[in-house]
C-alpha cells in the first residue's frame, strides 16, 4: 500500500504547476509565464482531503475515440470550482505510473489537491485531465508483453494525446 507521504511529491508538483500560467499543451491564448520560481511549500496534512465547508468543482468521466488504439478510451476531466465556459483555463495532463490507469488520480483525490492548492496558495484554477497512458485497447490490463513491447505502447501515448485527447478537450471545454 502506498502511504499518504508518498503523494506529497505529487501535491508539491501540482501546487507548482498551478503556481504559473500553464501554456502550450492545450492552446491557451496567454503566453505569459512567470520567471519567479518558488520551490518550497508547506504542504498541509489534509492536502488531498475533502475539507468541510469547501466547495469543489466537478469531475467528468469522458470517452473519446483513439485512432492509436482503434477504440473508445476513458478519461477524467477535473473542472475547477465556479468553472465558467466564457473563461479560458490552462490544462494540466496527469500521467500515471507504469501499471496505473486514468482512475489513479481520482482515487487519490486530485480534485481536492487542485482546489486546496488554489485556496491555500492563491493560485489560478486549472482544468486537469487524467487518462490511461498505456495505448492498448484494453489499457494494458490483460497484457502479456515483455518490457520493450510495454514501453512502445507507452511511447505511442504521445501520438494519442496530441491527435485525440487534446483536440477532444479543446472542443468540449473552455481552454
Describe the residue ranges of each PLM region.
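Non-catalytic cap/lid and distal C-terminal segments of serine-dependent acyl enzymes
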Residues: 29-175
Amino acid at each position: 500500500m502506498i502511504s499518504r507521504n508518498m503523494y506529497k511529491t505529487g501535491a508539491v508538483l501540482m501546487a507548482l504547476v498551478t503556481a504559473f500560467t500553464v501554456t502550450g499543451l492545450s492552446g491557451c491564448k496567454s503566453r505569459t509565464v512567470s520567471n519567479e520560481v518558488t520551490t518550497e511549500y508547506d504542504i498541509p496534512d489534509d492536502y488531498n482531503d475533502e475539507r468541510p465547508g469547501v466547495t469543489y468543482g466537478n469531475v467528468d468521466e469522458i470517452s473519446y475515440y483513439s485512432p492509436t488504439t482503434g477504440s473508445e478510451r476513458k478519461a477524467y476531466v477535473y473542472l475547477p470550482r465556479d468553472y465558467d465556459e466564457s473563461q479560458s483555463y490552462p490544462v494540466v495532463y496527469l500521467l500515471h505510473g507504469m501499471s496505473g490507469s486514468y482512475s489513479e488520480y481520482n482515487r487519490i483525490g486530485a480534485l481536492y489537491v487542485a482546489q486546496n492548492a488554489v485556496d491555500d496558495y492563491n493560485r489560478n484554477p486549472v482544468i486537469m485531465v487524467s487518462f490511461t497512458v498505456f495505448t492498448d485497447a484494453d489499457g494494458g490490463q490483460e497484457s502479456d508483453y515483455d518490457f520493450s513491447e510495454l514501453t512502445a505502447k507507452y511511447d505511442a501515448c504521445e501520438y494519442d494525446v496530441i491527435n485525440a485527447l487534446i483536440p477532444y478537450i479543446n472542443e468540449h471545454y473552455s481552454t
